[in-house]
């Protein structure tokens, strides 16, 4: 299973970037192999609807779970269609959020928690 | 390094005047204007521009006349009436690329469009990063991202421990871009019906970022009932009101003179502004 | 005659000028139309106690998927520049609120699985009283692309009327849509550096579009000539000055127009109109 965290850097020591659609990178961890790598979020360069482009990117990288701060309605719909589960946190290092996720301390989003454009 | 972003929801609440005061009280900080659609912090801080950069936003269509066969297909299919007589009106073009896809002669290309400029400047109170979006250009959220990224780099270079950003009005995409990753959001509001209306929405937006959120009521004595209403609302939203600035003609006078009100050095707002700044420093220090 | 009213900065008194100008022209031989194109916050109707005679919905086409025809080839996703379509796990998802209705997906779908279907984006309301018509556009909540609704309001323009168009603040796309093709633009500003800063942006926009303009200074104070100096420098006429007076603000806050609360303003607005007519004739 692959877990992605929206981040401002490329390692587990970097901070969570709470904006799903506009974060710089996703740090991805493969639960089975234990491997960690980062992908650039090219979705953030979109003129509009960056959340949808980002969801597509995560789908293409076969991500199963994404940990982020804010999810808008469009991004949520797209992630749902891609069968990617969303967990939300507010701040901390990528490794801390992964730890919280593994311990069951992050809440699973059942709907968008911000409006379009993050409003 | 700490980042403070000043936002307001509604425009015209005195956000920029308060930031101007903070710039002088902080002594030396990195100043950043995230209102790229209608920047106005420069009016108070009088920056001298040191470096200018171009900003390319969305792509727009361009016709290559040497390949165009005048078939008229693009003109017929363009929903925005942006193509007339083989010419593209870049103001009307929304960059949908339908023309690019349907052109049988491959005579249309999509080209990044120069949508604005951004600058690194010097002011008396520290370096400033600001921008100007071109006329009728979209994509201001992306430009705000660019400006803030540069602000962090410049602050690092100059060994500055604080970035103070002026956020755009509203609650749309550019506001979100100016809040992401900030340590503290200071919401400047006023005791009017629309001020009250916007407060709840903007506080909700800010609290989604896990930053410290606090409220300052500007011109609080214009309507004491509304002021109390705002204080109650803030309590309900669990955000502290850390400053109440009285209506002060000196604020308007300072704007007319193009200087921060603290430099003018008179009026009823001086002391409350100083106290507000102490509160901000205290909250930022505790983080 | 089509006159647009704009201001770089919000809250400068655009609607105050538009409503009083319209009321002052009621005795003119030509009919008067006031178009409220501030579709996100239409408020001109507050000042005219008129019953709405009719309302029309505004629709824009968005794609609809015929899942029997769809081959999930991804062409539409590739074509759409606005991320309004996503292909996930063999489902095609459409996002109506980011769609620009460009038609790319349905023109280019190889199996004709996408067809345009109308989506309501707003409404246009019309009220009439004698030879005066008020046309108001309202953007549907949850929609944020206002130019199509503005265009629908402007489609009601009558070439034989004096048309006054009140729009949103700023100098961005919606404002360009309201000033486009008008004979003259009245810019409403206030005498502060912030007002001037935004006035300059609005004037730059009008120059690009080649539209003649003049300035109304609202909340004018005699000791301040910041706007005067700019206008003199640019050769822009100052059409009217409305002084900074609490009576004006108070009456206006109650929903009473300037010419109604103080009838001596009526000849001044009439003069403003005649000045605009002369400027356009030049």
Task: Mark where each language-model region is.
Chain A
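Conserved residues at the C-terminal ends of beta-strands
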Residues: 69
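Non-catalytic interface/targeting segments
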Residues: 1-53, 60-61, 80-82, 89-119
């Amino acid at each position: 299973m692959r877990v992605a965290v929206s981040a401002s850097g490329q390692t587990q020591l970097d901070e969570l970037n709470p904006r799903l659609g506009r974060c710089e990178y996703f740090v991805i961890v493969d639960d089975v192999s234990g491997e960690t790598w980062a992908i650039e979020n090219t979705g953030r360069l979109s003129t509009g609807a960056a959340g949808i482009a980002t969801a597509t990117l995560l789908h293409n990288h076969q991500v199963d779970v994404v940990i982020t701060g804010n999810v808008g309605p469009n991004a949520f719909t797209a992630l749902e269609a891609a069968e990617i589960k969303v967990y939300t946190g507010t701040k901390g290092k990528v490794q801390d959020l992964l730890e919280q996720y593994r311990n069951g301390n992050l809440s699973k989003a059942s709907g968008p928690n911000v409006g379009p454009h993050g409003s | 390094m700490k980042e403070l972003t000043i936002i307001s929801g509604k425009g015209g609440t005195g956000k920029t005047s308060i930031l101007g005061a903070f710039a002088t009280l902080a002594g030396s900080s990195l100043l950043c204007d995230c209102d790229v659609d209608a920047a106005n912090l420069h009016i108070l801080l009088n920056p001298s521009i040191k470096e200018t950069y171009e900003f390319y936003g969305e792509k727009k269509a361009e016709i290559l006349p040497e390949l165009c066969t005048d078939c008229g297909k693009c003109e017929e299919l363009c929903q925005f009436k942006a193509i007339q007589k083989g010419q593209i009106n870049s103001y009307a073009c929304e960059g949908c690329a339908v023309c690019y896809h349907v052109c049988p002669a491959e005579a249309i290309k999509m080209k990044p469009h120069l949508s604005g400029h951004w600058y690194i400047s010097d002011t008396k109170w520290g370096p400033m990063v600001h921008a100007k979006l071109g006329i009728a250009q979209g994509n201001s959220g992306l430009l705000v991202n660019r400006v803030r990224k540069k602000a962090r780099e410049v602050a690092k270079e100059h060994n500055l421990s604080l970035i103070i950003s002026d956020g755009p009005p509203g609650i749309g995409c550019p506001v979100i871009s100016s809040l992401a990753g900030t340590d503290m959001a200071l919401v400047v509001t006023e005791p009017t019906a629309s001020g009250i209306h916007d407060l709840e929405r903007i506080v909700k937006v800010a609290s989604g970022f896990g930053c410290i959120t606090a409220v300052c009521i500007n011109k609080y004595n214009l309507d004491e009932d509304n002021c109390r209403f705002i204080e109650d609302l803030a309590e309900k939203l669990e955000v502290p009101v850390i400053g109440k600035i009285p209506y002060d003609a000196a604020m308007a006078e300072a704007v007319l003179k193009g200087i921060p009100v603290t430099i003018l050095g008179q009026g009823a707002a001086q002391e409350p502004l100083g106290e507000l700044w102490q509160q901000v420093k205290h909250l930022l220090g505790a983080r | 005659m089509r006159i647009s009213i704009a201001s770089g900065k919000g809250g400068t008194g655009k609607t105050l000028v538009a409503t009083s100008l319209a009321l002052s022209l009621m005795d003119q031989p030509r009919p008067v139309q006031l178009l409220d194109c501030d579709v996100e916050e239409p408020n001109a109707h507050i000042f005219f106690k008129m019953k709405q005679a009719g309302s029309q919905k505004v629709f824009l086409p968005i794609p609809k998927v015929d899942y029997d025809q769809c081959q999930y080839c991804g062409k539409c996703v590739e074509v759409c520049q606005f991320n309004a379509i996503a292909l996930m796990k063999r489902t095609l998802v459409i996002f109506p609120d980011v769609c620009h209705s460009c038609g790319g997906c349905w023109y280019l779908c190889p199996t004709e699985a996408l067809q345009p279907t109308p989506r309501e984006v707003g409404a246009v309301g019309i009220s009439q009283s004698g030879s005066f018509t008020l046309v108001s556009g309202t953007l549907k909540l949850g929609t944020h692309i206002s130019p199509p609704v503005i265009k629908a309001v402007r489609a009601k323009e009558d070439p034989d009327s004096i048309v006054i168009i009140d729009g949103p603040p700023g100098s961005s796309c919606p404002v360009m849509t309201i000033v486009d093709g008008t004979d003259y633009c009245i810019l409403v500003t206030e005498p502060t550096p912030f007002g001037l800063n935004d006035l300059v942006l609005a004037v730059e926009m009008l120059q690009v579009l080649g539209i003649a303009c003049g300035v109304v200074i609202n909340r004018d104070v005699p000791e301040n000539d910041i706007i005067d100096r700019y206008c003199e420098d640019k050769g822009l006429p100052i059409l009217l000055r409305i002084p900074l007076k609490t009576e004006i603000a108070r009456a206006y806050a109650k929903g009473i127009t300037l010419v109604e609360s103080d009838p001596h303003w009526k000849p001044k607005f009439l003069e403003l109109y005649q000045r605009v007519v002369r400027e356009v004739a030049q």
